[in-house]
Each structure stands twice: as structure tokens, then as C-alpha cells.
């Protein structure tokens, strides 16, 4: 009887401390502070309100920091990637709040500092900066090899793909990544076909991280061709993009704060 009781207590304790892969706390916070534009292609964050209600964010980030590498490594790949994307986005919010009010994330730090390389949080047993999460873990070749993460991680800027009003979760990760990708690509202010010069003009994200898209599809043009229908309403133009018969140019990036 005592053995059975101990087993039940252990099981109950394990369930109580199990990590929430639904990221419910983060979804609740995002739903309360993130708003979409009417087209559903851009979002803004109410940072002023978030500052006044910061405790839930700090508690959520603390729960992420408590996860060690052994626990992380035991998860399935989708849960790992969802965790990392949410960590990046959550700690980016914290970085903005720590320095608010600001006009741009690039204004954070001294003139010789890169805000993405400031070590200010603990994750997976290490003192980390944002670039580590994105470039050394998420983008590590052979690990996830998922170019759509570039439309999921949010740099708190107008030019960046939208911060969703929900957390990423492993059970729906593929659908969420695809939805975020399509929302960004169909935004004609950031990705569009320019008939005047017969050019597909896309976000600078594709210039900075072109290798990720090339690794996935063989070339950037081939990757963009998958989404030809989003860049133009003209079927002839869409076919040109599918057949990779358009040149590619890059638009300037808007680093203004996404508020």
C-alpha cells in the first residue's frame, strides 16, 4: 500500500512539474497585447500595457529558463522548435520592456553593441543572447533546417514578419509556420511584383538568410516559386514566378518599433 502511494505521489509530482508544451501562459499574454491589422499581415504590440502587466511574461520566461538540456533533448523535434521560437520572441519582448520607450530595437545598447548579442537571459543551462538562439541553435545546419522560422521569430520591428497573437506549439507547428509565412509573403508592402522593371521585390530577410532557402529548395527563386500566387493577382505574372523568369530584388527594411 505504501509503495502504491509513493508511486502515485511521484506520478502526481511529475505531472505537476511537466513543461506546458501548449505554452498557454504565453498565448494568453500575446492575445492580450498583440493586435493584427485589418489584412492580417502585420501586428503591433501594446508595450505600454505590457509594462503594466509584465509579471506573467517574467513568470513564463522563468519557466523556460528552468528547462535543462536533458529535458529539452527528450522532447520531439516539433516541441523543441516551438520552445525555441517562443523563447526568442518572449525574451525579445523582455529586452524591449527593459529599454522602453525606444524607437527601434537597434537603439538598445551602446554604439558598439549589437542588441542581439547582449547576454541577458538563461536558457538550456547557459547565459545566452538572442543571436545564439536563432543562429547557433535554430539555424544550425542539419538540426531543424526549417527556413520558415524566419517568419516566426520576431525582431520587434515593422519590417519583421508579424508576432502572432498566440504561442507556437508543437502539435500545430507546421500549420502555424505556414500561416505566418503566407501572411508575410502576401503583404505587398514587403513582398511584391514590380511590373515596371519585371522584378520580384522581396524583404531583405531573403538576402540576409538566402542560404537557408537555397538549402531547402535549391535556390531562392525555386523557394519563392512555391508561393507565386501570393505575389501578384495576375496569373501570367504568377506563372513567370513559378517558372523563375523574373529577377529578384530586395526592399529596404523598416526597423521602427512594432507598436
Q: Language-model features: where?
A:
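N-terminal signal peptide c-region/cleavage motif recognized by signal peptidases
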Residues: 11-13
